[in-house]
Amino acid sequence: MRAAGPGDGRAIGALATRAWRAAYARVLAPDVLDSMDPIEQAADWLTYLSDLPATDRVWVIGPPVEVWGFARTGPCPDADAPAGAGEVHGLYLEPARIGTGLGRELFAHAAADLEIRHEVVCVWHFAANDGAGRFYERAGFALDGASRPSSFGVVEVRRSRRRAA
């Protein structure tokens, strides 16, 4: 586990595209997934990682020259979230590595790092993505009643967990 740097932008962009296509094949319209361009994703990630806000973190898991998964975290921008809440904005794993425990390890690290700075940690996922719901529930995150329409035409739900005392 390590903090991502600008040199990881290309690998994260390519992984994000593969992960979305695998994870959301039954959730999002095919044209949405087909429109994802790994080159554009890589450029966006390079830009973001080159000027990473001090409040944000991007964690990667894998050997030094590879990215098997990544998690992006930062403050939770939701007006209805508890004041000062943190959020895991994204968690993606190489599709072939799902079920190996790497996702749990990566998510646990990202959530624990957020809990150093935030009393409550939130995560959003597509409501139709039952696997994600079970994953977050096993990690102690419960539905908190918040939902919203996504820009992709499907509903997202929020889960949250309060830092242990």
Which residues does each predicted region cover?
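Structural motif
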Residues: L15, I116, R138-A139
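Hydrophobic beta-strand residues of extracellular immunoglobulin-like
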Residues: R57-V60, C122, V157
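Conserved GNAT acetyl-CoA-binding A-motif
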Residues: L114-H125
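Terminal substrate-recognition subdomain of acyl/acetyltransferases
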Residues: V155-A165
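Acetyl-CoA-dependent GNAT
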Residues: A3-G9, A14-A96, R104-H109, D113, ...
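Short amphipathic helical patch at the helix-1/turn junction of helix-turn-helix
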Residues: L93, F126-A127
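Conserved active-site alpha-helix within GNAT-family acetyltransferase domains
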Residues: T100, R104, A128-G145, F152-G153
